[in-house]
Amino acid sequence: MKQLALSLIFAFPFVVFGQERNEIIQQRVEFIAEQTESEDIDLTNIFDQLNYYYDRPINLNNTDAEELRSLGLLTDVQISDVFLHIKQFGKFISIYELQSLKYWDLATIQLVLPFVSVDDRFDQMHISFKEAMKNGKFELYTRYQNVRPLKAGYQSVPDSILNTSNSYYHGNDGRYYSRFRYTYRTNISVGLTGEKDSGEEFFKGSQKNGFDFYSAHAFYKGGKYLKSVAVGDYLVQIGQGLNVFSGYAFGKTPDIFTSKRTSNLLRPYTSVDENRFFRGGAAVLGYKNFTWLNFYSQKRIDGAGVADSLSDDLEFITTIDASGLHRTNSEIAKKNQIGERVYGSYLAYQTTRLSVGVAHVQQSYSSPLVKDTVPYNIYAFRGTTAASTSMDYNFVLRNVNFFGEVSYNSTNKSFAQLYGVMAALDPRVSISLIHRNYDKDYYTFYNNGFSEGSNTQNERGTFLGAKVRLNSAWTINTYADYFSFPWMKYLVDAPSKGNEFLFQPVYKPNKVLEIYARYRQQLRQKNSRDNDGTVTAIEDVVQRNYRFNLSYKVSEAITVKSRLEYVSIHRESNAPEDGWVFSQDIVIRPKSSPFDLSLRYALFDTDSYDTRIYTFENNALYVFSAPSYYYQGSRAYILLRYSFLRHCDLWVRYGTYIYADRTSLSSGAEEITGNRKTDLTVQFRVTF
């Protein structure tokens, strides 16, 4: 075995030992930002996972399939390759041995290297208090953000108007964030997070306790029989997300392997999304190949309805508000109006190649949910309680990974089904095939299955993707997705269908240059803008995006990135619209300097908001920016990071928009007078 390791070292001297942590994490986050098309997303939990493994890489000689899956960078076939290698040749002696794995190409190795290691020492099962305090990691973050000029909602008005109108915000324009967290390896995590959104009060009025949102957790992992336990806020992720999958999951991206859900079963919650998490307690027990999860959650969520004169709860609920914003009178009135209780159990049998599990989840609101009786809501969930039972599987047979889940809602007597196959047809060719069928009346509170729509409901579709590595420099990523919606949707007053195609060739001849082009076409059916007021016809809406992206590493310290993107939209009832964005980035990260610098200048010109283009932006650690550029104008920002006193970091980012065709921005309480808008982020971190 040692001879094999040595021969690999000399045979493959060109392997690049990893990319910069920020570059790798940005690539993953950028995929998510593009898919969500949201300007304000919180991906802390995903970032935490990669960030942790960068600081403390996974020991390939002392790991399991679940831990490797949690990276989100490997397929199950590639994970199976690791354990097959150990079975045939023994423990890894050198990290270079990864090149001998059949389904690990150089791109995969370079992507994963910063997060894995080879060591013959094993982590100890027993953790002493002294060891935990000595080698644990403490982190403290504090952050301030604002946007100027002040929006209309921040005008100073008399209390008589402020307390009766929904046009003004009760708090100032600052957005505050603080977070404390202690971690010891992946075994222990204790944290407290607080956040105030812009416009919310702080230590006064409706927020006398300071932050509008608090989140706390205590988490332990590592016992033989008590595998993990969580108290406070946590995430539960089971199977392919048809029954329960709290937190965020990837959707369709150029990386076809992200179409499969990677479930982490039980994790601490560290984000500030005020909805998609559980609050209570959970534990995972293990015996031999069996894993048993039990969890209970009870919390208050936002919503509105008809008040009950005999209790604090609503008589019935008409809307559930997931914005997490409490700035105006109406938003404050919705806060914590609904009681939510979720509990469940999951039993799984797991080996290196096989996993089969069964879950049952019971979910209830404090009052019946009764949505508006508009046609598209006919099959929406109504009532107080929903119960669902699911079965999921994951099986690796040689170079093929079979996976899927079937979930049954006994309340509505409806099903959600997903079946998938990922196969490495050749070390250079991989495919992903997924078929889903979600009944129009299927409903669970925390589903998050692979879908075109925003819910795991009212959808049928088939996704086929491929990744082809032509040679060491060229890679092709492509997919096609055909889908239909058996019933109406919001702004679609008839059953509809659509499709989506993506083709992305990537040229990366070495570690300093990467060029890719992307063509993406989306066809969706929406209500026609031409109607007689009685019957609304639907029409095809075709959007095409063309992108050219270049990244060049000028030196070890300097990277330049250029991007040009063009979008066009065609629909029968409207004239064609289009738009473009050109952005130029410079990133300076000298290894011997305490300073990092990121700069961007962008020009954009689009016909309307419909032709907006979302673009990832660098920001402070744990701040995720994906703003949309639309109308005519320019965008620029500068981000400076300063590391000092060994344990301290300071980030300062200042950005500005200048619009050439606007005299005011947005409307209502969000309106800004003038054609300029600036944003500021200041964040401080101390670790010890």
Positions of PLM-derived features:
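Alpha-helical interaction/regulatory segments in DNA maintenance proteins
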Residues: 20, 37-51, 88-89, 99-136, ...
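Outer-membrane beta-barrel proteins
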Residues: 195-213, 267-274, 333-336, 407-409, ...
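Amphipathic, charged-and-aliphatic alpha-helical interface segments
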Residues: 43-93, 112-117, 196, 200
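Exposed, low-structure sequence patches enriched in small/polar residues
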Residues: 169-173, 276-278, 333-373, 378-688
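Transmembrane beta-strand segments of Gram-negative outer membrane beta-barrel proteins
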Residues: 127-164, 182, 186-192, 229, ...
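Bacterial Sec-dependent N-terminal signal peptides
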Residues: 1-23, 688
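Outer membrane beta-barrel
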Residues: 209-266, 270-302, 425-444, 593-609
